[in-house]
């Protein structure tokens, strides 16, 4: 099988992955194994397929092999970190996230910074989580989940005003982020600013009635009445 045919078949594999058709993707992947098993792309696709099939150990094998072949494969390192974390191997997950973030050619380093920050926060390492929340936003200030991470890191350090400020910054980055509006409203509730919180809950209900956050906002408004 020539390299052009391998490339075309891997394109088909990835199309199936993107459409959540993991069994079809695996069938196509196995057809090119003999010709493509030396490629990091082949093993990355394998990792993605087994992740979709909830076969975490086999998914881990795919991503681990991908980074063995290409040590600078940032996305594979990040995904390996997520699998290690899901398997309860926090130390290995942290190492993989740190490696991903250190790769200068990795196009989306904010993902690994965020994932690492969330891991650190879960472990009670709030100051380090703050550092990686900041790093995620330094790489991509439009990556909205990082604002919530940074705010939660501040809350864990009892820096409530800083948490409020960073959530407001997140809202400035994306005025239509219902998750950020809800997070800011909930934070204002914790700070006793119930009138300001009610305005934000009302905004979600009126402007984004079909959002997943609208139900929570309605419940808060009923509680505040």
PLM region descriptions:
Residues 5, 39, 73, 107-109, ...:
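Residue-level recognition of tetratricopeptide repeat
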Residues 11, 45, 79, 113-115, ...:
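Canonical tetratricopeptide repeat
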């Amino acid at each position: 099988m020539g390299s052009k045919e391998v490339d075309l078949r891997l394109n088909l594999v990835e199309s199936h992955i993107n459409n959540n058709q993991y069994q079809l993707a695996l069938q196509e992947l196995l057809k090119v194994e003999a010709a493509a098993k030396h490629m990091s792309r082949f093993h990355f696709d394998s990792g993605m397929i087994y992740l979709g099939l909830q076969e975490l150990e086999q998914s881990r094998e795919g991503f681990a092999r991908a980074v063995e072949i290409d040590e600078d494969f940032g996305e594979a390192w990040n995904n390996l970190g997520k699998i290690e974390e899901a398997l309860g191997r926090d130390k290995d997950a942290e190492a993989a996230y740190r490696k991903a973030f250190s790769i200068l050619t990795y196009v989306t380093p904010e993902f690994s910074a965020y994932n690492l920050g969330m891991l650190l926060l879960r472990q009670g390492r709030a100051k380090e989580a703050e550092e990686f929340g900041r790093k995620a936003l330094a790489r991509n200030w439009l990556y909205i989940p990082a604002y919530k991470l940074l705010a939660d890191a501040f809350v864990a350090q009892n820096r409530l005003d800083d948490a409020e400020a960073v959530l407001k910054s997140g809202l400035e980055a994306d005025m239509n982020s219902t998750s950020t509006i809800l997070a800011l409203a909930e934070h204002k509730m914790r700070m006793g600013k119930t009138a300001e919180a009610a305005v934000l809950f009302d905004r979600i209900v009126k402007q984004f009635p079909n959002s997943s956050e609208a139900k929570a906002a309605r419940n808060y408004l009923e509680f505040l009445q």
